[in-house]
A protein has these predicted regions:
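Short active-site loop/helix that positions an aromatic residue
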Residues: 215-226
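Active-site and NAD+-binding cores of ADP-ribose-processing enzymes
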Residues: 1-170, 175-202, 225-357
Length: 357
């Protein structure tokens, strides 16, 4: 039986399952010693559903390289800092050989990604992506409350429900406010409805409580300037929170996706739509934005709040990509427990030439 290093893989579900194999040794593929190893037949069993999404192309001109597509489409699967890309074909071929239930021709020939080769799936995925654009246009310029074309709400509901994470009672979150005047702990929550401007998640006049998962992220989100005074509020969940997690959809590992309850091919069909929702929520508010720009995400967040009954959404911070934000609909479930007064001592900017359009 052959083995490879467990940490070649990024998918948290593979890492979790692989922890039961405690035999350290040398990985012949990454040329590293004293690393935790995992047997190749086990990897074949775990990865079978992923590689079953590929088939041999009818002609070389129509096909794609398996390794290239896996790395591009599933960036949450393999860690290229642990293994050279040029070694991956040999590793995957030996996984196929050791497992004995996969088509080794996928390595040596050009392949097609079957969900995209299926015309019905192409039409479905294309329709979902174009529906986002149609939804945006209709909400902005035609109908605000009653749409002329309905989305596939049953499928969207199923996908969003599978992305729910329970944030346990006692969890800590943070919010920063800029002010030269004293802000009391009782004032650190969401703004009053008469002062609530439109946000990515909330409509004008309907405030949500925007929190960050760590202090650094909320500092970035506040966009405080040098020497400005910041009030940092620490919030605690008074009860469990059911949050739809939309952060880093594109980096979900394929085994992790199945562990969440998705059929892998079905997830592929909805992936673009979920990524679009995630990306739109993550975009920072800009001065040039119109309130109209936020209508599609507001509409879907209201669906998550009012129809599905969840407590909020979580999404990646555009201001601090290593952190994430939460829009809490039911703010009575969290409480500000502490406020610190801070001063900005340093601000750094990174700029690049603007691309011509």
């Amino acid at each position: 039986m052959k083995f490879c290093a467990l940490d070649i893989f990024l998918d948290p579900s593979i890492l979790s399952i692989g922890e039961s194999y405690t035999n350290p040794g040398e990985c012949p593929y990454s040329k590293r010693r004293n690393v935790q190893l995992i047997p190749l037949p086990f990897l074949g069993e775990v990865l079978e559903n992923i590689f079953s999404l590929y088939g041999v192309a009818e002609s070389e001109n129509e096909g794609i390289d398996l390794v290239d597509h896996v790395l591009d489409y599933w960036p949450g699967l393999i860690d290229l800092t642990k293994i050279q890309k040029s070694i991956l074909p040999a590793l995957i071929e030996e996984i196929f050989d050791e497992y004995g239930n996969l088509d080794t021709e996928l390595i040596n020939k050009k392949v097609v990604f079957l969900p995209h080769a299926d015309k019905s799936n192409q039409d479905f995925e294309y329709d979902l992506n174009t529906r986002w654009e149609k939804l945006s246009h209709e909400l902005k310029y035609q109908n605000r409350f009653f749409l002329s074309e309905e989305l596939d709400w049953d499928s969207i509901r199923t996908s969003l429900e599978l992305l729910v994470r329970t944030h346990i009672k006692g969890g800590r979150y943070y919010r920063a406010r800029i002010s030269e005047d004293l802000i009391e702990r009782s004032e650190m929550g969401k703004p009053p409805k008469e002062k609530a401007s439109a946000g990515r998640a909330n409509p004008i006049g309907i405030p949500y409580l925007y929190l960050a998962t760590d202090p650094q992220t909320t500092f970035y989100e506040s966009r405080a300037g040098l020497h400005e005074q910041i009030f940092l509020g620490e919030f605690e969940a008074k009860e469990n929170l059911n949050i739809v997690s939309l952060e880093r959809i594109e980096f979900l590992g394929p085994v992790e996706i199945q562990e969440l309850g998705f059929d892998l091919e079905e997830f592929v069909r909805f992936r673009g739509f979920l990524m679009k929702l995630s990306q739109e929520l993550s975009k920072p508010i800009r001065k040039k934005d119109s309130d109209f720009d936020y209508l599609p995400t507001q509409y879907l967040c209201e669906y998550i709040k009012s129809v599905l009954g969840f407590d909020g959404v979580q999404y990646q911070s555009a201001m601090n990509p290593s952190g994430s934000n939460l829009a809490i609909f039911n703010d009575h479930k969290v409480e500000c427990t502490d406020v610190k007064v801070l001063k900005v001592e340093d601000v750094k900017y990174k700029v690049s030439p603007r691309e011509e359009t």
